[in-house]
Amino acid sequence: MADERRQVHGAEYERAGAGYMEKRQLRAGAAGWVLLAGLGIAYVISGDYAGWNFGLAEGGWGGLLIATLLMAVMYSCMVLGLAELSSTLPVAGAGYAFARRALGPLGGFATGTAILIEYAIAPAAIVIFIGGYVESLDIFGIEAGWGLYLAFYAVFVGIHLYGVGEALKLMFVITAVAVVGLLVFVVAMVPEFDASNLTDIAATDAGGASDFIPLGIAGVLSAFVYGIWFFLAIEGVPLAAEETRDPKRDMPKGIIAGMLALLVFAALILTLAPGGAGAEALSGSDNPLPDALGIAHGEDAFVTEFVNYIGLAGLVASFFSIIYAYSRQLFALSRAGYLPRGLSVTSGRKTPAVALIVPGLIGFLLAAITEDGATMINIAVFGAALSYVLMTLSHIVLRYREPELERPYRTPGGVATTGVAFVLAIAAVVATFFVDEKAAGITAGVFAVALAYFWFYSRHRLVADAPEEEFEAIERAEAELAG
């Protein structure tokens, strides 16, 4: 390993040697824009089946509608910004890489850490929900517990270890099955819609309360977290950049197509589920779509049973896909030296084996020991919201700092678009404290420990060869030539 070190922006870089990057190669060309769109939908689709409805208890239907509309605007604006950033900087680091270019090593690591918290914790929460779902369906008498959690982690981490192309294609099929379930639900609920069902939660004496927003203005803010569920994790699509055939063209098309589909699903589910079954009836449901069908058509109706079983595919799709996401973010942070370098070594099949297994083991232990899916998903939401603030800020900073940077896709509206997302992301961070102070506190604690690790250790050991860091070297060389 080369001994030469160079200090840039308060961090120390070294050349890791010729063989370093050869041991850290992903399989290029595994995905086109259609698979990327499917990946984006897969990340999110479990949120259409469950979770969003708890916002009915926090803000009523009107409060959740307002929150969802605002979050839809935030995600849409952010996705347009990410489409530009991912075509401009098409590397596996994604959000970390964007912030690294705009905000320096500390900003890059902070963003990557927030994303990693989101993606490492979310599968642990989802596997708990899968366990509850399997038990409620009485599939072969299987009960929720550590054995089931271990089996799901082992199977789906194993598929990712086998190969990214195979994993993405299987993920696409599972996601397609889950989408069919949503479409069947929509067709079955359209004839049952009654607008009076949307506002059947009684108004309270909270400030600003009415029949439309029965829990007042505070209820709207509390519902933000649940409006996020319709879109949470779509921002992970750029993590596939190094495994995409033509990232400069495919990445914008894939992430935007995925977002458009999610907007349609959110509008249909939020309107038809409570509109057919009643907002109050679904406000505490663990399985809102089957419960809505049960109220409208009967618990023993074929359509109710069908969507109930298909709902498991939605949970599995998100679990499967987010494992992919955490491995790529961890891989990129490790490859660049922000986290231990051994975590980024790839296998002979060009999959980041260690980055798949280590967070999987941690997630399994969290699920088995705590069995507290609600707290963990709120931790994931808090991490996500922090990353949104930093990623949208990165887009704004890069537009002003590097206006001549080659941008194969340009965000419509420019910084005005991502500026809207930035403001709403700050509001989303604040909203997490209204819903779960414990989860927000845990996330902040983990974040602080990670930043301390960076400040006192890893910033002195960064790798100049990593693609996300080479942009810095190129920029510095150009500046020296110009000078």
Residue ranges and their predicted role:
Residues 22-26, 64-65, 141-147, 173-308:
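Helix-loop-helix junctions that connect adjacent transmembrane segments
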Residues 25, 170, 342-353, 388-439:
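C-terminal membrane-solvent junction of multi-pass transporters and transport-like membrane proteins
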Residues 51-58, 67, 76-153, 157-161, ...:
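Hydrophobic transmembrane alpha-helices that form the core helical bundles
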Residues 70, 378-379, 384, 413-483:
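A generic transmembrane alpha-helix motif of multi-pass inner-membrane proteins
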